[in-house]
Amino acid sequence: MWAGILEILSAFIRILFKLLYCWALFFTVLKGFSRGPLLPLIYLINKSL
């Protein structure tokens, strides 16, 4: 029983870290290119997710 709970928890944590990484990347891109060509970048990010 505990093994299953631990597996679910580790999978959840992995997904959470992936989401946090995506958000950090997104905000870094937004800060870096706030005066640059934003629309193509947002399009590429949406396509890659």
Swiss-Prot record:
The chain crosses the membrane at residues 5-27. Keywords: Membrane, Transmembrane, Transmembrane helix. GO terms for cellular component: membrane. Its main location: membrane. It is found in: Membrane. It is a single-pass membrane protein. This is Uncharacterized protein YMR013C-A. It comes from Saccharomyces cerevisiae (strain ATCC 204508 / S288c).
